[in-house]
UniProtKB/Swiss-Prot annotation:
It is found in: Cytoplasm. Monomer. GO terms for molecular function: adenylate kinase activity; ATP binding; metal ion binding; nucleoside diphosphate kinase activity. This is Adenylate kinase. SUPFAM superfamilies: P-loop containing nucleoside triphosphate hydrolases, Rubredoxin-like. InterPro entries: Adenyl_kin_sub, Adenylat/UMP-CMP_kin, Adenylat_kinase_CS, P-loop_NTPase. Zn(2+) binds at residues 147, 150, 163, 166. One of its GO terms (biological process) is nucleoside monophosphate metabolic process. It comes from the Bacteria. The keyword Phosphoprotein does not apply. It comes from Chlamydia trachomatis serovar D (strain ATCC VR-885 / DSM 19411 / UW-3/Cx). Residues 35-64 are annotated as: NMP. It catalyses: AMP + ATP = 2 ADP. Catalyzes the reversible transfer of the terminal phosphate group between ATP and AMP. Plays an important role in cellular energy homeostasis and in adenine nucleotide metabolism.
Length: 245
């Protein structure tokens, strides 16, 4: 696969495997894994003006406005972009000159803000959609267990009662109930479809069948990325963007 800097955004319904696939891709392609959920938890644990602003919304049970969530993500992206420039100037390898973003954007406004930023530094960024059926989401979420220590995810079929890595007893998430899961699926569809439409229009979307086993989904992503990047290279080589008048 092409070794030039790469930026990926991964999207999908609850239970589609975003976290798992993000980690696999980060390891395989030397990507920095940026999770908006991790950024939020980290921000709340600190005492900064931004964290205080976030806490004020959370304490009132209010949703964070798009601009505030973007400020949090942009802070990390700006830090990452500056590090990337330093690596390029130092003629270092691509290792972590590229990244995968998980959990953001969730609205069209957020998508537009992110697109404006990425267009300047990673114009060929791609959005991976893990497309999964409602039935498979229900099957996965109603049978999953989580390690409270390392956040590892396991399912009933694996037969673990404790985490094989931490030896900590596995637990069920309190919101992994049928009623809550159905509500989360519906909310996801309502919120995400406009974002998917936006990325489809921008020709950034790569749709992957996520109903398959983990490794099969992972290979499908790699194959699709390779095909997409090769096509982009050929398209660029055939254009006259570098031709003089």
């Amino acid at each position: 696969m092409d070794r030039s800097p790469l930026f990926l955004i991964i999207m999908g319904a609850p239970g589609s495997g975003k976290g798992t696939q993000s980690k696999l891709l980060a390891s395989q392609l030397s990507l920095l894994h940026i999770s908006s959920g991790d950024l939020l938890r980290d921000a709340v644990s600190k005492d900064t003006p931004l964290s205080q602003e976030i806490k004020s919304y959370l304490d009132q049970g209010k949703l964070l406005p798009d601009t505030l969530v973007w400020k949090l993500v942009h802070e990390k992206l700006d830090e990452f972009q500056q590090d990337t420039l330093l690596r390029r100037l130092s003629f270092l390898s691509r290792s972590e000159n590229s990244a995968i973003l998980d959990g953001f954007p969730r609205t069209v406004t957020q998508a537009k803000l992110l697109h404006e930023f990425l267009s300047s530094y990673f114009p060929n960024y791609k959005v991976i959609l893990l497309d999964i059926s409602d039935e498979e989401v229900l099957n996965r979420l109603t049978s999953r267990y989580i390690c409270p220590a390392c956040q590892g995810i396991y399912n009933e079929q694996q037969g673990f009662s404790s985490c094989p890595k931490c030896s900590v007893e596995l637990i069920r998430r309190s919101d992994d109930t049928l009623e809550v899961i159905l509500d989360r699926i519906q909310t996801y569809k309502q919120e995400t479809q406009p974002v998917l439409d936006y990325y489809t229009e921008k020709q950034k979307l790569i749709t992957i069948d996520a109903n398959a086993p983990t490794q099969q989904v992972f290979q499908s992503i790699l194959d699709s990325l390779s095909a997409s990047l090769v096509y982009q290279e050929r398209d660029c080589c055939n254009c006259d963007c570098d031709d003089e008048d």
